[in-house]
Amino acid sequence: MDIRTGNGFDVHAFGPGDHVWLCGVRVPHHRGLIGHSDADVGMHALTDAIYGALAEGDIGVHFPPSDPQWKGAASRIFLEHAMGRIAARGFTLANCDVTLICERPKIGPMAPAMREALAAIMGVEVGRISVKATTSEKLGFTGREEGIACIATATLLQA
């Protein structure tokens, strides 16, 4: 049995807006996130974790930010592509774990909806997906509420 684990990390700065996209859920917030696509930091980190487990680079390899067709793109496109690569390579997703790092918005109340959204996009049962949050105890750029960071891990199995 081939077991693979990949890690992903992403960060986006706050900018103008009235919401952020996190793990496929529109979360009301007094600022938005700045990015080439919809800046869904959770989906970006998770997508990179999957590509890492497959040893297939990162989002930038598959969807170059220099390509204007990806400007403002929904991050579900990237995650769906990564899931397609899992299937094409004969793997299945065993588990994924997403940790959002921010002071605000508060993630806890939204985590169940984020798990459901990711499960629907990825075509897996919600029990294979963890979404949680932590703060940086007011330290660094997330502590100063300048942006949101995310780390994700994906474990893949091939029988």
From Swiss-Prot:
UniProt EC number: 4.6.1.12
Listed pathway(s): Isoprenoid biosynthesis; isopentenyl diphosphate biosynthesis via DXP pathway; isopentenyl diphosphate from 1-deoxy-D-xylulose 5-phosphate: step 4/6
Cofactors named for this entry: a divalent metal cation
Binding site for a divalent metal cation: 10, 12, 44
Cofactor binding note of this UniProt entry: Binds 1 divalent metal cation per subunit.
Positions with a binding annotation for 4-CDP-2-C-methyl-D-erythritol 2-phosphate: 10-12, 36-37, 58-60, 134-137, 141, 144
Catalytic activity: 4-CDP-2-C-methyl-D-erythritol 2-phosphate = 2-C-methyl-D-erythritol 2,4-cyclic diphosphate + CMP
Reported function: Involved in the biosynthesis of isopentenyl diphosphate (IPP) and dimethylallyl diphosphate (DMAPP), two major building blocks of isoprenoid compounds. Catalyzes the conversion of 4-diphosphocytidyl-2-C-methyl-D-erythritol 2-phosphate (CDP-ME2P) to 2-C-methyl-D-erythritol 2,4-cyclodiphosphate (ME-CPP) with a corresponding release of cytidine 5-monophosphate (CMP).
NCBIfam families: ispF (TIGR00151)
Record protein name field: 2-C-methyl-D-erythritol 2,4-cyclodiphosphate synthase
Organism: Cereibacter sphaeroides (strain ATCC 17025 / ATH 2.4.3) (Rhodobacter sphaeroides)
